[in-house]
């Protein structure tokens, strides 16, 4: 009887633990791809909203710039670096005549939606002369955005490239 009780208690603890891990164990890092995708979409939308406010044409997604931005964001997150990519790399690999880049390192904030992070990032870029210049340049026609979380989970690394 005692063995049955111990087994039953052990099973309840195991099932409870699995349920807890299933509910709580999905951190933003584990749920990262969908959160990151929503943030990337939000960054493009926020950038276009801001560009429209200043009578600039909106930019459309470009798969080459997108892949390059995603790869660079992952590289920066994994290596704990915060530097711009050589623009010649983007110009050549994506066959473009003009390109600019904005990067950001944004602290993770529990409960903050991907859309809120995206809007806040664009708002902060608008407060910086160089980032603002890139964001409002009349030259770009296309955009690529990449987002990656640092291994410690403390930051989102954001890369936005716009080109012509």
Spans of model-derived segments:
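Secretory targeting and sorting signals
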Residues: 1-31
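A well-ordered secondary-structure block
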Residues: 89-163
């Amino acid at each position: 009887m005692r063995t049955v009780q111990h087994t039953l208690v052990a099973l309840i603890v195991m099932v409870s633990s699995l349920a807890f891990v299933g509910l709580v164990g999905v951190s933003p890092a584990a749920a990262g791809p969908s959160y990151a995708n929503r943030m990337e979409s939000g960054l493009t939308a926020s950038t276009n909203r801001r560009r429209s406010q200043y009578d600039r044409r909106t930019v459309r997604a470009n798969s080459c710039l997108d892949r390059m931005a995603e790869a660079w964001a992952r590289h920066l997150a994994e290596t704990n670096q915060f530097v711009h990519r050589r623009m010649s790399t983007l110009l050549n690999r994506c066959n473009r005549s003009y390109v600019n880049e904005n990067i950001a390192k944004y602290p993770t904030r529990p409960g903050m939606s991907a859309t809120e992070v995206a809007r806040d990032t664009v708002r902060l870029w608008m407060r910086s002369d160089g980032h603002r210049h890139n964001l409002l340049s009349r030259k770009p026609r296309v955009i690529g955005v990449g987002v990656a979380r640092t291994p410690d989970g403390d930051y989102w690394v954001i890369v936005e490239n716009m080109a012509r």
